[in-house]
Amino acid sequence: MKTLVSALLALASAAAGAQGYPAKPITLIIPFAAGGDSDLSGRNLAVNAQKYLNNQPMVPVNRAGASGAIGTMWVRNAAPDGYTLLVARIATHAILPALESKLQYKWNEFTMLSLIELNPYICFVRGDAPIRSAAELVNAIRANPGKLNFATAGIGTSQNMASQYFMTLAGLTKDHAVGIHFKGGGEVTTAVLAAQVNFACNNAPTVIPQVRAGTLRALFVTPARLPEIPDVPSAAEAGFPGMNAIVGWTALMGPPGLPREVVERWTAVFQQLARDPGWQQGNARLGGIAAIRSPAETERFVREQFELYNRLVGMLGIRQ
């Protein structure tokens, strides 16, 4: 009986703690500059989540630098009380941990709260290119080894990884096509438009308007067809189901050792956000696909992403 009473008291205490949190504003660290995908996604979360957080404000703070590592470390070292949280991205928790051997944190040193959204990727060519499908692109690369090129935003970026992984899945080597590195995702799209390169893979929001205008031709999209460009096949439909692993994403994480009641409160908040029209509309407007998951599912997803990019970094020989 004493054991049962103790267990009930513990449950009651946890429930009370969950209801009592938060009792003050929450700082939401965005580890990238204002105006980018991470910033917009974080602010959409903040403005819509606070109504389910005892009306306590979520205050976005941009701590950019070192490809997201500075802001990420800030949260890694924060007090585990639930009042400093992180907008985690594919760069901070998959690519950087795989790429940087001396990175000061590991991807799994955080409390996972929820995956938030997926950000589709599109592989594409110029609108007037003779290549009309992924299979035709593979044939063109194979027939002209070392002569075709693709645009990336840098060696360790998801744009580079996406094109390299596509060639790997097609049975090509990294030398079959040449990567040309630009300064950002916007320049990647522009490079294809200007015929500086033959193809690229990039975040959907910068590509969709050009596809709709006919100036770019999308070969496939990950992870599924998009309503904005419904005639563009998914990667699986184009014959490359493995490319569905190449997708941008956002998650909410906290420092290691967050109390269980804080994790449970956020699980409840995300269940409400999943039905919240304001969050849904903001997410769709920013080109995201809602992907709310449990903490355990989020950890499994992030682990799979890290393992994928760890393999790619090793294959490309670019680990630093």
Which stretches of residues belong to each language-model region?
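Sec-dependent signal peptide recognition
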Residues: 1-10
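N-terminal signal peptide c-region/cleavage motif recognized by signal peptidases
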Residues: 13-17
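N-terminal (or domain-start) structured segment
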Residues: 18-109, 147, 171-201, 210, ...
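An extracytoplasmic/periplasmic, membrane-proximal ligand-sensing/linker region
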Residues: 23-25, 212, 237, 260-320
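Hinge/capping helix and adjacent helix->loop/strand transition within the periplasmic-binding protein
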Residues: 77-84, 90, 98-188, 235-237, ...
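A ligand-binding cleft/hinge motif common to bilobed small-molecule-binding domains
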Residues: 91-100, 164-171, 198-233, 310
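C-terminal lobe and pocket-closing loops
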Residues: 207-275, 304-307
